Amino acid sequence: MASLLQDQLTTDQDLLLMQEGMPMRKVRSKSWKKLRYFRLQNDGMTVWHARQARGSAKPSFSISDVETIRNGHDSELLRSLAEELPLEQGFTIVFHGRRSNLDLMANSVEEAQIWMRGLQLLVDLVTSMDHQERLDQWLSDWFQRGDKNQDGKMSFQEVQRLLHLMNVEMDQEYAFSLFQAADTSQSGTLEGEEFVQFYKALTKRAEVQELFESFSADGQKLTLLEFLDFLQEEQKERDCTSELALELIDRYEPSDSGKLRHVLSMDGFLSYLCSKDGDIFNPACLPIYQDMTQPLNHYFICSSHNTYLVGDQLCGQSSVEGYIRALKRGCRCVEVDVWDGPSGEPVVYHGHTLTSRILFKDVVATVAQYAFQTSDYPVILSLETHCSWEQQQTMARHLTEILGEQLLSTTLDGVLPTQLPSPEELRRKILVKGKKLTLEEDLEYEEEEAEPELEESELALESQFETEPEPQEQNLQNKDKKKKSKPILCPALSSLVIYLKSVSFRSFTHSKEHYHFYEISSFSETKAKRLIKEAGNEFVQHNTWQLSRVYPSGLRTDSSNYNPQELWNAGCQMVAMNMQTAGLEMDICDGHFRQNGGCGYVLKPDFLRDIQSSFHPEKPISPFKAQTLLIQVISGQQLPKVDKTKEGSIVDPLVKVQIFGVRLDTARQETNYVENNGFNPYWGQTLCFRVLVPELAMLRFVVMDYDWKSRNDFIGQYTLPWTCMQQGYRHIHLLSKDGISLRPASIFVYICIQEGLEGDES
């Protein structure tokens, strides 16, 4: 079975040299630089390394895990070593998810270029593969792993070992019968196409075959009309035309004769079901499909907390990599904590902690470079400034000189605005959020309203500094603060704050009477949640005309996250997350912003944009129309083995479905577990949910490995907005804990949404 990459591997000069192997230094820090021998494996999909040229090698990384390749000049670590290592000989391998970058130093510029070109070629090839090509490559990878003696053939003993690796528990006699049927050459081994036939027999899906035959008159093919009937009746694509059905046949039918006859074979039908058209996520929601001309405060905005940190909040590393990763995943609001640094250069770090420091100008340069690589819509720099007057001037100079035309330094067209501009009007602009001087303030310093230093850095009990003082006590505190020696706000920096002036929140009434649409308040998660419970409707109305930013509790020193859904329910636009930390909360955030082109802006439902809205997230009442969701969890495909330390174990998978939305809609149900089958488990169970406010609901599908002795192990998940869900027979392609695709791992479900009557709290 020839690999899809075989042509390139045998003809491309760079790939040929990479297969021979080269020595390179692996760089982790200024003091850790080790010589290693790296070699591209013959499958073209994995790179191994060894301590010595002919020493025992082990896997270093898979090409499918690589996001991009950067040259040495773009590496924060390699730049710090520029005096001892030539940057032209270095390069960085950036991985998907949260895996640390791999910095390498070649022996020459030419060798570095060979690896950079070769790796980028392989990454581009993998990225451009369609479903069938990915499946073929996946099969090729498994064949390579199963063929222990690398002779291009697989004995039955090797096949048995491979089945175990693939999570298949199968009767030996049945496995041998499949093996013999595939061994058409009768050589006692499987080669190339014989292994493909063995795999097809192994993965024959009775549930899909049954579905296919229920719509096919002859059980062999679906005619154009039969396929159209399936799309309209089962897939609930009522507006589907025969032209669209024909387009799908042309796209997924593998045989030319089938395309000419306008029919879909069983293979074509399965290919359609496994494609993006058969995915649970509606393809119509993937591009930018929402109105982007409304004021900024009408959108949920993907936001990051302490963006510079790639670890915990007390001792973690500060790095520009945090900004690169946040911006490339579509984040549109990043945080910058700035303090006085040596030699007059401001630095960014988590004040009063042991976190490392990076230069403010490096952060600004990174934002300038990466701000609009993923999305053209505006980026907000949330400044927390703790600098002296002089270093504030330096900050203003860096922002102006480095960002140039990208920086919004005046109102649009110089006109006095009456509302916030829209994302469309602010395309490719960077906005500064921070404190701003006014004539009334007469250059007096106003205490930063958000993220009190005690809460963030000294970890006093949260309640001590999140309890709002009485007005009289507040005034005394403010006077006392002004007596202390504090840096005065520099006019040059103040003038760069155009639409996003930070102000202290006192009450919703006070905001209505004294504040303007271009001002923004920040809330700790605890305070925001309390306000939702005590005055949920007022909070919703507040967020229809002014922006709110919510940040994690200072007690989350491990960089854990809160559930953003609770804050979105009240219309809070900027719910800042610790993006370096994977988990349920980030799954919800990623799933929410997967829609609308992943541009980082999602239009809020109309009832969260109406200033007269009566909506209360804790008490949703009519006119919201409830919906009932029926999910038949049918089967799973090629689920990975999660805990490789459990020798000889095969997963016992179960599926958990979670709903996140308003409190009354939050629910979870799960299937039974299937014993010893991660390859093609079958559940056939139906779960039922009733949701009052579908516009705010998120669905999370989680596959777990059941363990009666301890906690179930996580296998994979997929999270999406209710409004982006397709009905009918759909595949859910699973993601890892880090959000990386686990293809071809998936679950097969049937989705049915029934409209309910007008719902209330009951």
UniProtKB/Swiss-Prot annotation:
Binding site for Ca(2+) 4: 650, 652, 676
Tissue expression from the record: Highly expressed in skeletal muscle and kidney tissues, and at moderate level in intestinal tissue. Expressed in corneal epithelial cells.
UniProt subcellular location: Membrane; Nucleus; Cytoplasm; Endoplasmic reticulum
Domain PH: 16-124
SUPFAM superfamilies, per the entry: C2 domain (Calcium/lipid-binding domain, CaLB) (SSF49562), EF-hand (SSF47473), PH domain-like (SSF50729), PLC-like phosphodiesterases (SSF51695)
PANTHER family xref list: 1-PHOSPHATIDYLINOSITOL 4,5-BISPHOSPHATE PHOSPHODIESTERASE DELTA-4, PHOSPHOINOSITIDE-SPECIFIC PHOSPHOLIPASE C FAMILY PROTEIN
UniProt free text on domains: The PDZ-binding motif mediates the interaction with GRIP1.
Descriptive protein name: 1-phosphatidylinositol 4,5-bisphosphate phosphodiesterase delta-4
